From Swiss-Prot:
Keyword Electron transport: no
Tissue specificity annotation: Lymph nodes. Associated with the lumenal surface of the high endothelial venules of peripheral lymph nodes.
GO CC annotations on file: extracellular region; plasma membrane
Glycosylation sites: N115
Organism superkingdom: Eukaryota
Name of the featured protein: Glycosylation-dependent cell adhesion molecule 1
Modified residues (Phosphoserine): S54, S59, S63, S71
Subcellular location: Cell membrane
Pfam families hit by this protein: GLYCAM-1 (PF05242)
Gene: Glycam1
Biased composition (Basic and acidic residues): 53-71
Post-translational modification: Extensively O-glycosylated.
Signal peptide as annotated in the record: 1-19
């Protein structure tokens, strides 16, 4: 039973590490204004009260939503990863990869971003310690189970 509990915790910790921001290449979407407008997106422009709509004809009321049209062709997806970075062969260790993706840059715009980066690094270090403890515990359980023989 302890083995499955440890396995559950290790799985949870690994999943938590995989979901940390910055652990994968982040994608940002940007839109560009266009004259060709095939796709529609609604945004609120004005609101009417219930009293005014009950006494007036609804067809004469201004529309609650106005459609802004954006072309699907003009949506640009850009990666935050530099283009000139060469692909590396082999596997990198998880901790060095996490440190690389969350290291504060000199172009950090605000101190809040720097604080977020530092706290993210602290959380990653603590999760690394927890995972090491789980792995050690799992190894101890497995080695202890191999010594047990049926009578």
């Amino acid at each position: 039973m302890k083995f499955f509990t440890v396995l559950l915790f290790v799985s949870l910790a690994a999943t938590s590490l995989a979901l940390l921001p910055g652990s994968k290449d982040e994608l940002q979407m940007k839109t560009q204004p266009t004259d060709a407008i095939p796709a529609a997106q609604s945004t609120p422009t004005s609101y009417t009260s219930e009293e005014s709509t009950s006494s007036k004809d609804l067809s004469k009321e201004p529309s609650i939503f106005r459609e802004e049209l954006i072309s699907k062709d003009n949506v640009v997806i850009e990666s935050t990863k530099p283009e000139n970075q060469e692909a590396q062969d082999g596997l990198r260790s998880g901790s060095s990869q996490l440190e690389e993706t969350t290291r504060p840059t000199t172009s950090a715009a605000t101190t809040s971003e720097e604080n977020l980066t530092k706290s993210s690094q602290t959380v990653e270090e603590e999760l690394g310690k927890i995972i090491e403890g789980f792995v050690t515990g799992a190894e101890d359980i497995i080695s202890g189970a191999s010594r047990i023989t049926k009578s």
